[in-house]
Amino acid sequence: MLSIQEIMALIPHRYPFLLVDRIVELEPGVRAVGEKLVSANEPYFQGHFPGNPIMPGVLILEALAQTGAVAALSLPEHAGKLVLFAGIDGARFKRVVRPGDTLRLEVQLERMRRGIGKGQARATVADQLACEAELLFAVTDPTK
């Protein structure tokens, strides 16, 4: 299990854009499972939607990407690197995510060649599928 401090040591995201609260399972370079405790205090709920708060789908995808970045950057050879989105394929949203939900974020990295990787991602709430997608990413030097 990784705490929020350990996550922040691996990825550069910070409030309000750090969307993973903890990592509950980690196989470096292979797989990560994270959790996001969705609070009514999230800044995006002010406008999405007043009186009917729903977590934006793009932020669910970002939370999945951050979980995948933790899996990739936990490899010693990727220490100090930056993971960037290279693409999203087949994204599907199956359930709304609301304040009070615990979003479970599962990313399985399938392939990594010359700094480009692919992973299968799923987000669930109470074992119900909320989102699934194939994520493409690039591991790069943060100064480039």
UniProtKB/Swiss-Prot annotation:
InterPro entries: FabA_FabZ, FabZ, HotDog_dom_sf. Pfam families: FabA (PF07977). Gene3D superfamilies: Hotdog Thioesterase. Its EC number is 4.2.1.59. One of its GO terms (biological process) is lipid A biosynthetic process. It comes from the Bacteria. Keywords: Cytoplasm, Lipid A biosynthesis, Lipid biosynthesis, Lipid metabolism, Lyase. Transmembrane segments: none annotated. The keyword Acetylation does not apply. One of its GO terms (cellular component) is cytoplasm. Belongs to the thioester dehydratase family. FabZ subfamily. The lineage of its organism: Bacteria, Bacillati, Chloroflexota, Chloroflexia, Chloroflexales. This is 3-hydroxyacyl-[acyl-carrier-protein] dehydratase FabZ.
